Amino acid sequence: MKRSDNSDNDKEIKKQKLLQELGGLQIPYLTPADEGFQQLWKTKYSKLALKEAHSTPLELHSQVQTALSILLERGCLFRDLVQMKGKDMFTPVSRVLIGAPGHTYKYLNTRLFTIPWPASGAVVRYCDDEVARACQAVKDLNDYLCVEAKRCLTRREGALSAAETTANVTREMERETNNRTVFNVALLNYMDPAAMSYLKEEPYFGMGRMAVSWHHDENLVDRSPVAVYSYSYKDTESCSAEGDEKPVSGRDCTVWRIALKVAWDIHTAGLALPLHSDDLNMTHQHCVLAGARPRFSSTHRMAECSAGTLEYIFGRCQVALNNLHKDPSSERPSLVSLEVSVLKQAEEIHNEVEFEWLRQYWFQGRRYAKFSDWWCKPMERLEELWREMELMTWLVLCTVEGEGCPAADRREAVQGVLPLLEERNQLRQHWRARCQSRLAKTLPADEEPICHPYWSDHNASMPLPFDLQEILSRLEDIVSPTGL
């Protein structure tokens, strides 16, 4: 469940190797003012599309910009306490996820839960009318961008010659395009560079300060586009620059820019495009270069939610709880099957519910109450099901430690579930430590991480202790060479 540091370490190794190859030199990059820019865009970055502000309805601009301003003024955008390379840190960007009810989006070991936008069949009670209108505006923008993204992909794929295209192929292309352009979440970002004491310099091209480092967007539906609405919030003093040299045309440090490069390639020139207020960009690999003024972006995407919706996790709970039986008259619980594969599956789901959902949700404090009470009931229900799974773990332990269990069956069952219980204990300590960290304590009261579920050893309502170390020691004795 815990995000592996391996991928971060691999990326850092690749980065250092490339920088070593460069030997202090910088890779060239082109801007719209440079000769060869259009040819480079066409040949190396053809999947980037830019839609200028004047081609988007003025009324939509007004609604969206009002919504973004309201969310900022109401304190509804948050700097996430994420984990990179095993260390907690705050994102330089404040953000919030708005999207389809019951959906989530995970990045940097952090699962964001959607503030639900209005949707057919969903009853959403917003905290007030302003927040409701803001969420509706984001939904309207999302609908517009879905149409624009579909149009863009259709134009690209329609470039196939008629000789290469059959009616069946055309219909299949249309279906695939439709499936890839139904954005289900919008990640809203805000950053004021003047409020940041430090921003990293772009390391490969010398492009300037980065608001968002080079990255691939995580957890997207394969080959789906990302649509980004950019809005420069208000004027500030121009950014400071060394010396008195006038910024090179197209490379102005006061202007927000999006930069693109070929991943792990030091031979292909990069691109840097200015982001004028209201522009739309679609791409997968990029960094964002900070300008002087505060900026919003609304990034619309098809989050890969096969394991990230309430429907999914409640379905998983049902699979686990199928192995729990309660006597209709006495309510006495028992396990339906003692097959090791069944026991393991239930414990895997138990861990998933606790660490991918409950602890992720409560680690973000009570921030979601600023918008709506929509998540309260589902999370209460999820915790009830998790408690049933705690009961199931207790039943497993009663069985394997009972006198009537044959030694061979006992050993096989313990070997199956022990790694999952060890992981559970480790992750409980990990999340508790994160909740008590120095950075966590700096957050406002309604954003401060909550270590939940947490209970003392004297809590009679819980069948097992929070700390499983004593139980693990007993189980380790069973599977040791000298165990019974």
Set out the residue ranges of the language-model regions.
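Non-heme Fe(II) oxygenase metal-center motifs and adjacent flexible, charged/small-residue loops
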Residues: 1-484
